[in-house]
């Protein structure tokens, strides 16, 4: 219990002091004179010039007042001076009115240690559990505070914004892969038709690639290769003619549609105009002696792929701005990137180290569609260099590897590769995994049996044999031999396309940026809580005692407060701040509907 002086002078019993000894709230002052004037303006129930306090033996100090108890019902506070403390003003709560007789009342009290020692205590750096902090940066963006509050925020979100972003707006690409060249080259004396044309396409490879840009309505962009107009055929005409040519259709390995081929192309959506590098592409006319020519684009080489940047705008755009900036953080707000094809990722918007949400698009010309969408500067430290920042963005990527195949009539090899693509990949993964596990587990003993069997036999018993690294190599060779054997079987199968018609016909292209926010009911509930109690910060620092216009809430843990104060009172002050208290800077104490802006 706080120390009480033995006597007091200028004792004033006051009414209408709007806080109590539970120390949930108090009035905070900037000077002792302001403090004195504030209390001195309160209604006075009774005054005494000099008194000796009683009740110390019972640990219930009181002052005897020559008034009937009925006259003191409004008494809530006492202020007095003490000559032994240099006429310091002491402040105290009235805790009880005790009836002595019809003319005398004992007014019990306890010292208000906060008001009494407010200008004697010194707050040192302490562990601050929660307090009111700066909500918004100077540019209007929310300050970052992601410490878990442990509060319920519901299980559902409102979708507040949906945006679709595509690498080249409405333009997409049909990719045709063949085993050999399907076109002649104008101006060349000897035709390269049916020649194997190994080239650089991200890496050295033996296949031939053709691309055909088009729009959903079947039209094609005005396409220039260098300065020459490529005069591309409409996409339907191109498909009709190419499948009418036996030599061409039997040469095709795969066909698919993709949004991005791995190159930042010079494309103007408004003009529907595409410009291509003549060193990388050439016009290709595919024809035979029975069918007319169709014009498309042959890929000569692509030494390196490039990432395309899509600027989606302000990362906070679309969210409803709340009074409390923490409600802009995860999990109260979520940015989702999805393609509506089973690929999605949730982002914590505050960890995008940029004012804008920028998406990096990476693609390639492989044997099937594969496009990666990554968020630039997500979880990227500002100390990272530019190149490393781009690399770091790959850690948060959405990869669309839906086949997007076009239905083809082809030889057994292509149909087998397409129809069993997932199976083959799973076999390869299993073989490599088992090979590694065999090495770790001492599979060296299996080497003899691997050497004694044929490659094809090894492939047929993948699930039943002990796999070592050597076995893995033999099994891979066996599977490749199986594929090579199939290449000799004549055309006989029809390969149907996958979900390409559904995805593209319904407009599911590129990626969608979806902004989600808490349901309004939970936003209101959390907003009122944060308005009253501030945010968890869990930091060692000096507390914010007067940074807001109306009130500051402060809660500490094992706080460090010093000063020329007796130990009992000092310990009580520390306990008050550890329990949490609201420091009011206006007389409207307890009114949380007031605006509480930063000073």
UniProtKB/Swiss-Prot annotation:
Pfam short name (any one): phi29_gp9_C
Compartment annotation: Virion
A GO cellular component entry from the record: virus tail, tube
Keyword Cell wall biogenesis/degradation belongs to the record: no
Keywords from the named record: Late protein, Pore-mediated penetration of viral genome into host cell, Viral genome ejection through host cell envelope, Viral penetration into host cytoplasm, Viral short tail ejection system, Viral tail protein, Viral tail tube protein, Virion, Virus entry into host cell
Principal location listed in the UniProt entry: virion
Domain of life: Viruses
An example Gene Ontology biological process: symbiont genome entry into host cell via pore formation in plasma membrane
Entry function: Distal (knob) tail protein that plugs the end of the tube before DNA ejection and forms a channel perforating the host membrane during ejection.
Complexes and interactors: Homohexamer; forms a hexameric tube structure with six flexible hydrophobic loops.
Protein's name according to its UniProt entry: Tail knob protein gp9
Organism of provenance: Bacillus phage phi29
Gene: 9
